[in-house]
Amino acid sequence: MGLSAHNKDLMTDRRTFFSAAAAAAAAATATPLAVAAQAAPRQPLLMPRRLQPGDTVALINPSAAVYERQPYEVAHDTLKALGFKVKEAPHLRARRGQFAGTDAQRASDVNAMFADPQVHGILALTGGSGGNRILPLLDYELIRRHPKFLGGFSDITALINAVHARTGLVTFHAPVGVSEWNDFSVSHFRAAVMAGESPTLRNPKSNEDALAPKSNRTFTVRGGKAQGPLVG
């Protein structure tokens, strides 16, 4: 049985509608990081200089606002214990709703700390949310001209991945300023960021009083050797 012209028009309209809806959904779910990564050709690797005691590390906050005094004190004390001088980005303590200042303020802090010749490394104070909102506002060419350590994790992942994708700068998944910098974290940070050593990833020693520890057990999914860049 054939279709009438009216039914054919309805089917065409439905196909057009669903195609447009799918395209709109894909565009709506595309994050600034995904757009930045897709738009940028692969960049040659830029290695930041190793941090050394006496260097100045800037604290930035690209994400959530911090409402108490203690997190700032902890971040300062931690970096000083590592041997660094500490500089706060101009809007580190700013607040705008749930974020640490406006998008423009948070982005300008990132740009300014990369441009500052007195700053040798940049560490995020905390994570949270909102870091992806500043990615289109970053000056990636400026960052490429002034490569330096950039570290953080959680919501800061968007920032460090976007900077790497757009500039080639090797960035670091690292504790943020308010993290608990235990022996495990400090030893890996010093090895990778200060000594330039290739890290060996292993679980911390267990303090369980048992012949066969139950926590943090590891197993091999598929044995063998692999080689390649570690990104993510």
Please report, for each region that a protein language model flagged, where it lies by residue:
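Mature catalytic domains of secreted/periplasmic carbohydrate-active enzymes
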Residues: 91, 136-138, 160-170, 179-180, ...
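N-terminal secretory signal peptides and thylakoid transit peptides that target proteins
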Residues: 3-25
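Conserved anion/nucleotide-ligand pocket segment
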Residues: 172, 176-232
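Glycine-rich phosphate/diphosphate-binding loop of Rossmann-like nucleotide-binding domains
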Residues: 70, 76-78
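C-terminal segment of N-terminal export signals and the immediately downstream linker at the start
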Residues: 32-66, 70
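N-terminal small/polar loop signature for handling phosphorylated ligands or for N-terminal nucleophile
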Residues: 90-147
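Short, acidic/small-residue loops that bind anionic groups at enzyme active sites
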Residues: 140-162, 170-177
